Amino acid sequence: MLILLPAVDVVDGRAVRLVQGKAGSETEYGSALDAALGWQRDGAEWIHLVDLDAAFGRGSNRELLAEVVGKLDVQVELSGGIRDDDSLAAALATGCARVNLGTAALENPQWCARAIGEHGDKVAVGLDVQTIDGQHRLRGRGWETDGGDLWEVLERLERQGCSRYVVTDVTKDGTLGGPNLDLLGAVADRTDAPVIASGGVSSLDDLRAIATLTGRGVEGAIVGKALYAGRFTLPQALAAVAE
């Protein structure tokens, strides 16, 4: 069954949602802790917790994120600004189930390989993809820099033994524009590692569509704006993917 990961994106201690990952496009939804506890109460088994300040290189919510992880009984995937030994150690020390490496995997392949080697399935790599002139390009640092060709980087990560990928279509994220099923399927077909879908989910039918890819290796879906905007409730979403 498809695993659902409600997203809590944190800016200055508050839960927010961005449009296409752009700084300044935030809509605020209250305290990060309250948001996370709310999703747990609604039946989430995983929370996707993102430090957007760290991702954009403008600060950190490290202590708060550790507090949130400590107060939750469910598993947490922690993301945002994890790009060196210090930030990786701090992220793992929160007690989260796993961390997502983003920019670091693109900018520092040697460090990324070591992190994957040392921490195994506690490390996933985020593949933030933008299609430009028919080419799948990766985006780094809050999606503002080019990180190379998707397939070349994926091949490298496969050799390094990456245990899981979180695939985001940057053009879809926060837009409620529907997920990029072709991209998800294409990545899943090129790896034996599980893939988590991120970006664009707008309806229960979108989740049902992603759920049809579980046989190809798509393990879960991160859901953000659709939940916060009230398109559906988490219990409705959990029921839809259990059908």
Swiss-Prot record:
Presence of the UniProt keyword Cytoplasm in the record: yes
Uppermost EC category: isomerase
Intracellular or extracellular location(s): Cytoplasm
SUPFAM superfamilies in UniProt: Ribulose-phoshate binding barrel (SSF51366)
GO MF term set: 1-(5-phosphoribosyl)-5-[(5-phosphoribosylamino)methylideneamino]imidazole-4-carboxamide isomerase activity; phosphoribosylanthranilate isomerase activity
Catalytic activity annotation: 1-(5-phospho-beta-D-ribosyl)-5-[(5-phospho-beta-D-ribosylamino)methylideneamino]imidazole-4-carboxamide = 5-[(5-phospho-1-deoxy-D-ribulos-1-ylimino)methylamino]-1-(5-phospho-beta-D-ribosyl)imidazole-4-carboxamide; N-(5-phospho-beta-D-ribosyl)anthranilate = 1-(2-carboxyphenylamino)-1-deoxy-D-ribulose 5-phosphate
UniProt pathway: Amino-acid biosynthesis; L-histidine biosynthesis; L-histidine from 5-phospho-alpha-D-ribose 1-diphosphate: step 4/9; Amino-acid biosynthesis; L-tryptophan biosynthesis; L-tryptophan from chorismate: step 3/5
GO annotations of cellular component type: cytoplasm
Pfam families (UniProt xref): His_biosynth
Listed InterPro entries: Aldolase_TIM (IPR013785), His_biosynth (IPR006062), HisA/PriA_Actinobacteria (IPR010188), Isoase_HisA-like (IPR044524), Isoase_HisA-like_bact (IPR023016), RibuloseP-bd_barrel (IPR011060)
Keyword RNA-binding tagged: no
Keywords: Amino-acid biosynthesis, Aromatic amino acid biosynthesis, Cytoplasm, Histidine biosynthesis, Isomerase, Tryptophan biosynthesis
EC numbers on record: 5.3.1.16, 5.3.1.24
Family according to the record: Belongs to the HisA/HisF family.
Protein name, UniProt field: Phosphoribosyl isomerase A
Species assigned in the record: Mycobacterium avium (strain 104)
Gene: priA
